[in-house]
């Protein structure tokens, strides 16, 4: 066995070792080079590092990945899978705005749940899906740590809430009045304000486009890629524009 074969064998063994460590199996089928996969899981980490036992999505990982996707001519579409409890507002909105500004077709799929700042992350794609049993919690913004009891604090909270609400309304079919009503609900969550939406409810209220799974989402992404190849402009619903 020559040096080149040894290097290839070592690289293959290292890859198998990493797969076993990360996924619990030695064989992981590779994703199509045409479609980039982004997973947003656990808690969206902000400027403070979360404890090591907390599953998290780091914006400093997502942003370079999104830039790489945008500049890579081989990638034709982006598939985003979400199962997140929410997290940092600034980091979540930064990732959501990056997803929204990508020129390539994007489709999101909510599995398990996409709560709090996970809501705009789900609606940021051109077209969104939610699995039948998945949930989405809409609630007002909240803060940990020191809070100063002054009118300016309320104004700051209000402005932050407006940023989130405006993004959701801009990227979904939900009316702003409906969104505000769901956020201020007091009889649904224990010791909290807000509303929990399950599968079809999110679609009925215009937050998510369709109930479906992986095959539905990938089929939709393929159709958007084909429309893009035909130079058809897509509107905010991921549908063909009449113009």
Go through the PLM ranges and name each one.
Residues 1-109, 113-119, 124-139, 143-243:
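N-terminal organellar transit peptides
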């Amino acid at each position: 066995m020559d040096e080149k074969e040894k290097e290839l064998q070592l690289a293959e063994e290292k890859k198998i070792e990493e797969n076993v460590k990360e996924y619990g199996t030695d064989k992981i089928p590779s994703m199509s080079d045409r479609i980039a996969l982004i997973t947003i899981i656990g808690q969206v980490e902000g400027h403070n590092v979360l404890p090591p036992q907390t599953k998290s999505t780091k914006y400093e990982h997502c942003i370079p990945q999104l830039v790489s996707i945008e500049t890579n001519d081989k990638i034709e579409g982006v598939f985003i899978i979400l199962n997140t409890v929410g997290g940092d507002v600034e980091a979540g909105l930064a990732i959501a705005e990056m997803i929204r500004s990508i020129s390539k077709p994007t489709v999101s799929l909510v599995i398990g749940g996409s709560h709090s700042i996970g809501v705009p992350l789900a609606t940021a794609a051109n077209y969104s899906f939610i699995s039948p049993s998945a949930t989405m919690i809409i609630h007002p913004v909240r803060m940990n740590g020191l809070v100063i009891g002054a009118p300016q604090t309320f104004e700051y909270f209000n402005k932050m809430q407006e940023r989130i609400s405006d993004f959701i309304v801009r990227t979904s079919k939900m009316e702003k009045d409906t969104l505000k009503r769901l956020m201020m609900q007091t009889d649904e969550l224990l010791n909290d304000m807000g509303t929990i939406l399950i599968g079809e409810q999110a679609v009925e209220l215009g937050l998510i486009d369709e109930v479906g799974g992986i095959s539905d989402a990938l089929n939709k992404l393929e159709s958007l890629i084909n429309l893009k190849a035909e130079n058809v402009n897509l509107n905010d619903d991921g549908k063909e524009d009449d113009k």
